[in-house]
Amino acid sequence: MNTSEQLVVNKLPTRTWNHLNVNEATIPWNVADTADLGTDSYAITAENQAQPLHIDLTGAAGFSRKHIAVDVAAGVQATVYMVLDTQGSFAVETAFKLHDAASLRLVQVLGAQDSALLYAKTDADCAPGAGVDMTQILMGRGDLYSDNDTELSGAASHYSAQIGYLGRGSQTIDVNVVVNHYGKNTECEIDTSGALKDAAKKVFRGTIDFKTGSSNSVGNEKETVLMLGDDVINKTVPLILCAEENVVGNHGATIGELDDETLFYFESRGISRAQAENI
């Protein structure tokens, strides 16, 4: 099977030095042989909002692609659970449309088996007073690419993301989060944490972009990375862009290993270093 084609994903909105290899990611893909699994559309309204929406998807053998569209009506409080898995190469593109004062609690579990690849693209557009609270967990042993783009279009709209991952073996984990602030008094909070062991590789790109007109808006992002192997590779790219004066943007990262005091605590209780790292 020809996999010489490359898809460019997880792009930074503004490019940085090419030699850092963080401007985007490329994934091998055979467009001609990709199975189109169609589009599923959902409408969450006042009548059905009490029942959480469950979306469980497994990719087909080889290359496959799926589209999801979710419309959340004005004033509705929606909950969506998504579980994505594959033994091949699977691309899932999900678009959320939130109307005035709608809220969405989104829980995503992204998984891929050995030698498999999952690309999950999640877009959200928030009207005035609308908001998304996303929890995303990246697990499994295959390569995982998570691409998240949120438009805070309306005043007082908001977005929060809690992202967790565990990289192991020779796995690649590549996460991109872009939040575009358009409306006034908009807020976002991005909190990412995870651990890398063996020879795992991880890239996290977090972009908060304050557009003209987004005055009195606030954006915060942070990442915590635990390094559990000499061969792991970690790249963290926090980015704050600003075209508006009266805004607040903060970013930070904590990257380190288990300290000697913690290891001594475990070893004094008969727990080896390897067991402590797994804990």
Predicted segment positions?
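Long, low-complexity, mixed-charge
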Residues: 1-50
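Conserved beta-strand/loop scaffold segments within soluble protein domains that form the structured core
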Residues: 30-271
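Catalytic-core signal marking the mid-to-C-terminal active-site face
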Residues: 277-279
